[in-house]
Regions:
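Glycine-rich, charge-decorated loop segments at or immediately adjacent to ligand/cofactor-binding or catalytic sites
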Residues: 102-109, 206-217
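Secretory targeting and sorting signals
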Residues: 1-25
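Functionally critical loop-and-helix segments that line ligand-binding/catalytic clefts
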Residues: 27-52, 217-302
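Structural alpha-beta junctions
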Residues: 81-91, 188-198, 219-222, 247
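Aromatic-lined carbohydrate-recognition surfaces of secreted/lumenal glycan-active proteins
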Residues: 95, 191-211, 223-225, 229
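Substrate-binding cleft of extracellular glycoside hydrolase catalytic domains
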Residues: 28-183, 193
Length: 302
């Protein structure tokens, strides 16, 4: 009897260990709630009917170029601050246009490590007015300062929003990628000094053409990424697993366009395992767009 009792006890122990796992396996994986989509808007949507506030939003500060103003900024921020995220205490994000022009007659370019009375600590040394990383760093720092002033001028009190740097070939850039990188580093330095989080919006191709490889010593290296180029909710989801713009970065948002609106998919912080129905954008009325709008839209976030 003793061997039988031992065998019976062993079988009961095995059943106790296997039972719950087997039940879980039969039940299948736990389904995650489908993530909601967000929108980004800016000056091209001025005068247009906006959709109901989405889960989250990103609003453009500029009018398509650095150091310009989105004329509808205040109204669009008011719309964006009705999103689900804003209701939960997270204000809508903003994005700013970026460019490195170099010393040209029609645009301001620095000649020293100062701007509006501020002494700028420059990792590239002294700016002498030339087309160098040192001067690009000061220029970027100054553009970011102006962007913050634009946001404050719109009556916005939530300065500590997430700020995205819009890096696209549609704006002016120099042939030297190191100079272009310094421009973005200067912007990042000023914005992070105000206590905000900064990220980069671009595509792999455009970022490679403008900036190229970024090393661990750059303040761009670990920034979160917002990747453009997806064509649908499904491909936006797939873009979450794409390579980041920098080796130390992470893909946080992906973007696709439908109708006259850009839609954004928020990537999960962990790898996607459970499959669930993808959220779909609400139908939008078709509107005729001019050739000029189409050309600008291809070069800028709308």
């Amino acid at each position: 009897m003793k061997p039988i009792k031992i065998l019976l006890a062993a079988c009961l122990l095995l059943a106790w260990q296997v039972g719950p796992a087997q039940a879980d396996a039969e039940a299948g994986p736990v389904q995650e709630a489908a993530p909601a989509l967000g929108n980004d808007i800016s000056w091209p949507q001025c005068g247009s009917d906006l959709p109901a506030p989405p889960a989250f939003a990103v609003v453009g500060v500029n009018g398509g170029r650095p150091d310009t103003v989105n004329p509808c900024l205040a109204a669009q921020l008011a719309w964006a601050d009705q999103t689900s995220d804003a209701a939960g205490g997270t204000p809508a994000a903003v994005y700013v246009n970026t460019a490195a022009t170099g010393p040209v007659d029609s645009l301001w370019w620095p000649a020293a490590n100062t701007y509006r009375g501020m002494d700028i600590i420059n990792p590239y040394g002294g700016c002498d007015g030339s087309e160098t990383p040192a001067c690009a760093y000061v220029h970027g720092y100054a553009m970011a300062f102006n962007d913050v002033e634009i946001l404050k001028g719109s009556g916005d009190a939530a300065v500590r929003r997430v700020w995205w740097l819009d890096v696209e070939t549609g704006n002016s850039w120099l042939w030297d990628k190191a100079v272009n990188a310094a421009e973005l580093e200067g912007m990042t330095a000023y914005l992070t000094s105000t206590g905000v989080e900064v990220g980069i919006y671009s595509t792999e191709y455009q970022f490679g053409e403008i900036v190229g490889e970024v090393g661990p010593g750059s303040n761009l290296y670990r920034l979160r990424n917002w990747l453009a180029g997806a064509e649908s909710t499904s491909s936006a989801r797939e873009y979450c697993t794409a390579s980041p713009l920098t080796s130390g970065g992470t893909v946080a948002l992906t973007q696709f366009t439908e109708g006259d609106l850009d839609y954004n998919y928020r990537c999960p912080r962990a790898p996607v395992t459970a499959q669930h129905p993808d959220p779909q954008p609400a139908p939008q009325p078709e509107k005729a767009r001019s050739r000029a709008y189409a050309e600008l839209h291809a070069a800028q976030i709308s």
